[in-house]
A protein has these predicted regions:
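Non-heme di-metal
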Residues: 1-241
Length: 241
């Protein structure tokens, strides 16, 4: 659902792009995000199978996106996509930099998230470059980011509460509190993202200032080999013959 809105927000400005290289990057971005949408459907079906109720979250998300489309300008929607892509990219970079983040996860799901993280990094500058070429208002973009980060924190917490208390897996509050501490507490993911998040506001900022290509190259060397993990018991359990 989120990917569909990201795509629409960029498509609205597609005809105004003059840079031929950027036009090609937008084409690739659209293809990747469409594929991500299908992968999210797969993940949601797996979560449903495990007892997590993702249908309620999807229903709420549809309403949120409908309100955004109805009430906000095309400029705001593109700016919001830029902000979302930045936050998603720094989360992806964190996942690739911190092996413990995915520790204990089943091999097929871990491989999927690593792959998804790599693709988020690969196209992390596309929406930003489109915005800068067709709009170029940095002050507006920075204001949008301040709104976006608050909304994302609120929505993330809200959705985790819904997942936690609509499934038997998180029946006790202690387990849920531990997860929230892991995400938001000292040494948690969100605190670790402070510096890369703040870099967004630096004068002359560009998404590639934070690097990231080295993580993509490392993944391609170490993980992008389908045969590599097939010998593991975890992989075989997730991919029955």
């Amino acid at each position: 659902l989120g990917e569909a809105e990201f795509l629409d927000s960029v498509r609205h400005f597609r005809d105004k792009i003059e840079n031929p290289d950027l036009k090609q990057q937008v084409k690739g971005f659209i293809g990747q995000e469409a594929h991500h949408s299908r992968q999210h459907q797969f993940v949601n079906s797996e979560l449903d199978r495990l007892g997590y109720r993702t249908d309620k979250i999807e229903k709420d998300l549809k309403k949120e996106i409908a309100k955004l489309v109805a009430k906000q300008t095309k400029q705001f929607r593109l700016a919001y996509t830029v902000c979302s892509e930045h936050i998603t990219a720094i989360m992806a970079e964190y996942a690739l930099n911190e092996p413990a983040f995915l520790e204990g996860m089943d091999a097929p799901m871990k491989d999927l998230l690593l792959w998804h993280s790599v693709e988020e990094i690969e196209h992390k500058s596309v929406a930003f470059d489109v915005y800068m070429e067709v709009v170029g208002d940095v002050k507006y973009l920075n204001k949008t980011m301040k709104i976006a980060i608050i909304i994302m924190h609120l929505h993330f917490t809200q959705r985790m509460f819904k997942l936690a208390f609509n499934t038997k897996h998180w029946a006790n509050f202690r387990e849920f509190a531990g997860f929230m501490s892991w995400m938001f507490g000292k040494g948690g993911m969100w605190r670790s993202l402070r510096q890369p998040y703040k870099s967004f506001y630096k004068k002359g900022f560009h998404p590639w200032d934070n690097g990231g290509l080295e993580l993509v190259e490392k993944w391609q060397r170490e993980y992008a080999q389908p045969e590599q993990n097939k010998a593991s018991t975890e992989y075989q359990m997730g991919h029955p013959a």
